[in-house]
Structure formats: structure tokens, C-alpha cells
């Protein structure tokens, strides 16, 4: 079984990546293959709502000048998908939002392409907005007819500066529990 994780943070190896890595380490210890993709520095265009994906029905977005189609294919090939984001003004990062919007249209246009795959949201927050971000990511999974594993709490870790989430014992334990329940 393979799990692909996307760090939607504008910072590589920051708090969001630390939380995702905690989940992945549990999955790897159970023998699962994992891959972490960092979206930092990528120019990912948002969906232009052209709906061409509904006429081509080829598992691809018509926009070809970024890596979104590569990422959609990685999600197709994996049994599990983790989408992680920091909170920016009470919502997910623009990179992750663009990926979700474009992948979401492709998923729906192609008969629920991710149906029955496991999807988990991971959120890094400083103070507020963690739950709305967590919910928004989970809505993508639900609309895509994916399975969302339970954890001990919401999959949110708190920290301000890089590395601070390691001090959020409850948040880190939640990620470990997510890894245990998400392995299927």
C-alpha cells in the first residue's frame, strides 16, 4: 500500500511537514510505502472553471504548465492521500487550494476517480482557523467519495515558529494516532 502526502505550506520542512512526517513515520513502521511532496516554491495555477475535464475525461486538467497532473496521477496510484496545510487567514494555503480545486474537478469529471481511497487532512495552526481548514480539506475528500480515518482529535497541531509543533504533545499524539487508524 502506498500513501502520498502533500505539504501545502509555502515553507519546506516547517510545522506542517513535521506533522505530516509524524503520520508517515507510523505508516512506514507498519510497512507502507510513503512519499512526501512539498508544494513550497511551486507555481500552481488555480482552476479556471473551463470544465474541459468533463469533455476530455482523461484524468487530467487542461492546464499543463505546472505539476498538478503529475500530482493527480500520484494520487490515482496511491491508496491513501494526506493533504497538509498551514492556516493562512483562517484557511488553507493557496497552493493546496489550487491543487484541490483542479484535482476536484478532474475527480468528479472522471467518475469519482479517488472513490474509496483513504484521505486525511493535517493542519498546522498558530492560533485560529485550524478547524475551518481541516473541514475544507475533508470536504474535498467527502465530495470525492473518499474514506476519512478517525483519530483521537482533529488532526491539528499548534505552533508559531518553525519546529514549535513538536512541543504540542496532544497535536503530535493525534498525528501518531492518525497514522495508526489510517493504515487500514
Each predicted region: which residue ranges?
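N-terminal beta1-alpha1 ligand-phosphate binding loop
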Residues: 2-32
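Cysteine-cluster motifs in flexible loop/terminal segments that predominantly coordinate metals
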Residues: 42-75
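Helix-loop-strand module that forms the ligand-binding subsite of alpha/beta enzymes
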Residues: 62-153
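Cysteine-centered iron-sulfur cluster-binding motifs in ferredoxin-type domains/subunits
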Residues: 8-17, 44-54, 79
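Glycine-rich phosphate/pyrophosphate-binding loop and the adjoining helix
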Residues: 1, 24, 29-30, 70, ...
